[in-house]
């Protein structure tokens, strides 16, 4: 699987992800980029789950962003509705983390759109490890969002066998 973590602090939001692609117990690729910028570089997005499924969802989400002039929450809700009702989309297995200058969200295949506590999101096989590390760093240090995301992803990769040390990190400063 993978690990994606998003941290927001001091007018900065960051989404970071590792690069491991696994097929069962085999590592197929170690440098996949699972984090990207969307909608004129104003939205960050990361995925965990099936790679082909995630790319389909990225395309659909970007279309929703265009349709709704970049309004993140409305686009996420519309994608989640489609994901729940469309027969093809219902079979996709992936989670998305999306963020803009104001909001961070998790979009699930069940049609849920969740705004997390503490401006912190972590998903994937190492998500719990990354979230615990990031929360501890948020509460006990003055590190930047970028530093917290990077350190928490490193900790997750040290613990989770489905997460590696290759990192893709995108940040928005606002």
UniProtKB/Swiss-Prot annotation:
One Pfam family hit: Proteasome
Regulation: Allosterically activated by HslU binding.
Binding site for Na(+): 157, 160, 163
Compartments, as annotated in UniProt: Cytoplasm
UniProt keyword Zinc-finger present: no
Active-site residues annotated for this sequence: 2
GO process annotations (BP): proteolysis involved in protein catabolic process
Chief localisation class: cytoplasm
An example Gene Ontology CC term for this record: proteasome core complex
EC numbers, comma separated: 3.4.25.2
UniProt-listed InterPro entries: ATP-dep_Prtase_HsIV_su, Ntn_hydrolases_N, Proteasome_sua/b, Proteasome_suB-type
Catalytic activity: ATP-dependent cleavage of peptide bonds with broad specificity
CDD domains membership: protease_HslV
Alphabetic keyword roster: Allosteric enzyme, Cytoplasm, Hydrolase, Metal-binding, Protease, Sodium, Threonine protease
Enzyme class of the recorded protein, top EC level: hydrolase
Single GO term (MF): threonine-type endopeptidase activity
Cysteines engaged in disulfide bonds, as pairs: none
Record family assignment: Belongs to the peptidase T1B family. HslV subfamily.
Function description: Protease subunit of a proteasome-like degradation complex believed to be a general protein degrading machinery.
HAMAP family found in the cross-reference section: HslV
Oligomer status and interactors: A double ring-shaped homohexamer of HslV is capped on each side by a ring-shaped HslU homohexamer. The assembly of the HslU/HslV complex is dependent on binding of ATP.
Protein name as it appears in the record: ATP-dependent protease subunit HslV
Organism: Shewanella baltica (strain OS155 / ATCC BAA-1091)
Encoding gene, per UniProt annotation: hslV
């Amino acid at each position: 699987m993978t690990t994606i973590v998003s941290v927001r602090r001091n007018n900065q939001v960051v989404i970071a992800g590792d690069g491991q692609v696994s097929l069962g117990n085999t590592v197929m690729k170690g440098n996949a980029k699972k984090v990207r910028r969307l909608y004129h570089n104003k939205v960050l997005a990361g995925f965990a789950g099936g790679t082909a499924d995630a790319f389909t969802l990225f395309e659909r989400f970007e279309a929703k962003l265009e349709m709704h002039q970049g309004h993140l929450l409305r686009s996420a809700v519309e994608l989640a509705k489609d994901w729940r009702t469309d027969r093809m989309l219902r079979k996709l297995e992936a989670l998305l983390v999306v963020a803009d200058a104001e909001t961070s969200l998790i979009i699930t295949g069940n049609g849920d759109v969740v705004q997390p506590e503490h401006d912190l999101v972590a998903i994937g096989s190492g998500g719990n490890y990354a979230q615990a590390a990031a929360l501890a760093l948020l509460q006990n240090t003055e590190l930047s969002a970028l530093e917290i995301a990077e350190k928490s992803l490193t900790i997750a990769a040290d613990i989770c066998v489905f997460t590696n040390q290759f990192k893709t990190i995108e940040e928005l400063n606002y």
